[in-house]
Amino acid sequence: MTTPTQASDSTDSSTQRLNKFVALALGVSRRQADELIEQGTVTVNDQPAKLGQRITTTDIIRHGNKPLTAQAHQLILLHKPVGYLCSRASQGGVPTIYELLPTSLHHLKPVGRLDKDSSGLILLTNDGDFAHQMTHPSFYKMKRYLVTLDQPLQPLHRQMINDFGVQLPDGPSRLTLERQHEGDEHRWIVQMSEGRNRQIRRTFAALGYAVTKLHRTDFGNYALDDIKRGEFAETSLTT
């Protein structure tokens, strides 16, 4: 008779890798799941888990003293309004994006951030590997924004941003600019593959401009499309 522990080490199609299970259950990457396994905080049937171990649906997995349950891959696209924080905890009474979601989705984590004064597309997922691939600079996931400036952008500054980038304290910032409307020097389509904190606002501020509106429309293969402000849509994961 096969015991649960023996079943965990099999390689047939009825099993899955432990690190994948842990990653989805905790919303972390598989690399982070492997680190938890190495640290000895994950058990399978009350036995210390092993790297590379496989499990079945009958195995009992715990992280610390907390039982972990199987989770399906989830991804939602949220249209964040201005005035909401991409955080679980409210600060000074400012609402968070989780107040726009049903409690059944509160386990999802945002992929990147938009500051309180910005609006547009936010991805939330329980897949840590997907989040890593969408946010790490080495994967070059393009993001698209509609940006309004407090004054017309000078041609020299546009060329500087497009061709050379702007030096910031945390390194050069390279953006691609295109007018939203011909002849309008206030409103720009900004594309970038990085995602440093308030990078667009800081880039323009370094040249003497204030961003009065910042709205994200696209993130990688995902677009806001017709999702209304404050609402969300569930979709499938693609990178």
Name what the model sees in each region.
Residues 2-239:
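Basic, flexible Lys/Arg- and Gly-enriched helix-loop patches that mediate nucleic-acid binding at interfaces
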